Amino acid sequence: MKIVRKDKYLIFNHNGFKVVLSQLGASIVEISYNDDVLTLTPINYEDLNRRDIYYGKTIGPVTNRIKDGLIKIDDKEYQLLCNEPGVSNHSGHLGLSNKLFVATIQDNRVIFTHLQKINNVNISYGIMYTFNESNEIRVDYIVRASEPFMINLTNHTFFTLGESSIDNLSLEIHADKYIESDKDTLLPKEVKSIIDCLDFNKEKLIVKDINDSYLQDHKSKGYDHSFILKDNKVILESTKYKLEIESDFSNVHIYSDNYEDKVKVKTSELLKNRGIAIEPTDDLLNRPILNKDEVYQRYIIYKITSRK
């Protein structure tokens, strides 16, 4: 395992497994294996500076959508910028996705840290990426706050697993419940039982039901849904590779790259449905409040194996 620092951080092992990290958003810029690019990665890295680009970035302090961008904690209110009509998505202007982190290399780890002040609340973030020879990436999140604040982090990597579209990607999620969102604003609404088009309890091609009327009668026109997990694993497979994601988050949000995006990426000339974002999260209906003197700790492990 070796870590090389240039303008970004290149990590590679003896198996041909490579990862590129960036201080911007403490992000995963690219994962490759056997020279196949396994993530949705812009050809021009400068595109990652766009505020509406979340590829591989850390999302927080609050992931997903908040009505009117308003956070209420006890008798205090915190206003986030609404970057969608009537909604703050991924924390708006306060989002970690466009914050520059401080990076430190330590053995087989890259540790990103950032201090943020929101009104009277001081928040410290530690995001640690650990690598090994088994083609695993472990992400540990550690957050502290000087006053109670809503914290719900995730990583927004889009996975392609060497494919140019989601057509040959299959997904397995063990879940009997999901969080239904408003079909117009996409705000989380209520817990409901899994329906057929959202049932991935047995491995299924993502595109099998993507044109189902339930999904198409929805602002996203595809998958943009949170599943309540029965266990701690999600599996994504292509013709060449298998990705296993383990975490201690209770939910996972699946987004199938539904909107046309003119950012040119390495793996596809398509404008949408080029990859799948798998975002482990806490409960989106009852987001956790981090109290003073408490520590927010979560982890995600990505393991990639070749099917050749």
Regions found by a protein language model. Name each.
Residues 1-308:
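An exposed, glycine/acidic-rich loop-and-rim segment of catalytic or binding clefts
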